[in-house]
């Protein structure tokens, strides 16, 4: 059975913590491939101002170029409009099944989603299509996270895996602020991502 991970996010910009999470998920879950999915318009973040999708896609592509087990998809960007997780997972389930009939999907995201999931559309369908894989983010109480995990699993008849990872203190917001303040970011992002940011004068 082929095992595929999908890691979604705005990736504005992608940074080394994203790559670490994807790599650890691949290793711990024995994934054959991890697909990065730059978000289109997210329903719960529809009013946020984000960088041009083509540039965000280019940054992800540049960041993963040396990882043969990573790929990037422009599905949500090309689709346009609001991006709903159940639609994205259904698209990939069908696409992957055309190539590998025997497959399993894992949707990788931050554990903060456990506290907003009841606002998502078609949650039961999401769990019918994929196993949810969450990683802890700063500010989340571990006991609260585990309680929410059990509650969501029971309510939606789903399966959730919690990845035990080191927390890297890197955030896209901090990187954007550092660029705006003319501070170095080469400790936090791959060199080619930094090149794209400065060439296109992003986050100024």
From Swiss-Prot:
Q: Does the keyword ATP-binding apply?
A: yes
Q: Which Pfam families match?
A: CTP_transf_like (PF01467)
- Pathway involvement of the protein, from the record: Cofactor biosynthesis; NAD(+) biosynthesis; deamido-NAD(+) from nicotinate D-ribonucleotide: step 1/1
Q: What is its EC number?
A: 2.7.7.18
**Annotated signal peptide:** none
- Read off the CDD domains from this record: NMNAT
Name of the top EC class for this enzyme? transferase
**UniProt xrefs under InterPro entries:** Cyt_trans-like (IPR004821), NadD/NMNAT (IPR005248), Rossmann-like_a/b/a_fold (IPR014729)
**Alphabetical keyword list:** ATP-binding, NAD, Nucleotide-binding, Nucleotidyltransferase, Pyridine nucleotide biosynthesis, Transferase
Its GO biological process terms? Answer: NAD biosynthetic process
Catalytic activity, reaction form: nicotinate beta-D-ribonucleotide + ATP + H(+) = deamido-NAD(+) + diphosphate
Give one GO term, molecular function aspect.
Answer: nicotinate-nucleotide adenylyltransferase activity
Return the PANTHER family for the record. NICOTINATE-NUCLEOTIDE ADENYLYLTRANSFERASE-RELATED, PHOSPHOPANTETHEINE ADENYLYLTRANSFERASE
- Would you identify the family this protein belongs to, as annotated? Belongs to the NadD family.
General function of this protein: Catalyzes the reversible adenylation of nicotinate mononucleotide (NaMN) to nicotinic acid adenine dinucleotide (NaAD).
The protein in question is named Probable nicotinate-nucleotide adenylyltransferase
Q: Which organism is it from?
A: Clostridium beijerinckii (strain ATCC 51743 / NCIMB 8052)
């Amino acid at each position: 059975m082929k095992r595929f991970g999908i890691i979604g996010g705005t990736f504005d910009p992608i940074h080394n913590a994203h790559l670490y999470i994807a790599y650890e998920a691949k290793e711990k879950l024995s994934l054959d491939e991890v697909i990065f999915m730059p978000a289109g318009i997210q329903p719960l973040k529809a009013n946020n101002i984000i960088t041009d999708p083509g540039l965000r896609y280019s940054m992800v592509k540049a960041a993963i170029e040396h990882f043969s087990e990573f790929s990037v998809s422009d599905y949500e960007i090309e689709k346009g409009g609001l991006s709903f997780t159940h639609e994205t997972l259904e698209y990939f389930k069908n696409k992957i099944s055309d190539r590998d009939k025997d497959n399993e999907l894992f949707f990788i995201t931050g554990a903060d989603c456990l506290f907003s999931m009841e606002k998502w559309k078609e949650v039961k369908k999401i769990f019918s299509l994929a196993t949810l894989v969450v990683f802890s983010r700063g500010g989340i109480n571990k006991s609260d996270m585990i309680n929410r995990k059990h509650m969501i699993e029971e309510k939606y008849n789903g399966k959730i895996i919690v990845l035990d990872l080191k927390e890297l203190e890197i955030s896209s917001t901090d990187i954007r602020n550092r660029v705006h303040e003319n501070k170095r970011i080469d400790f936090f992002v791959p060199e080619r991502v930094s090149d794209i940011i400065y060439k296109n004068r992003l986050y100024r």
